[in-house]
Amino acid sequence: VKQFPILIPAQIQTSGYEREIVERVARLCWFNHDLDGWLEELREECPEEYDLPDEPIIWNEEQRTVWQAELDAIFAHLYGLRTEDLRYILDPEDVCGKGCINETFRVLKEREIRELGEYRTKRLVLEAWNKFGFDN
């Protein structure tokens, strides 16, 4: 069990990023009143200064994508990744060059380029990574 690649709650609590994680997870999960009880339990367990929503979050795909990217960046940092590692995971060609035989999120990348004109996930995760000042 000690070798499983998972973070335990104590690691998150002492990471300095617990608040950022909890606030974003609350906003991603609480989008209707079905989870009112869950949010109340969360509110009871969290310090008062945590910025938890007062009402379910209105679904906004753009904002949700940013919160998800911020969580991806935080967890990549907590797993000990460096910028080049994260770039490789998001898009091996970005590190190895065109023709790299490794693929990670090819379907996501192709869909986003086709639908959005860019690999948005990669851009947002790396923007969040830089915003938090990881690996600097």
Enumerate the predicted regions with their spans.
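S-adenosyl-L-methionine
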Residues: V1-N136
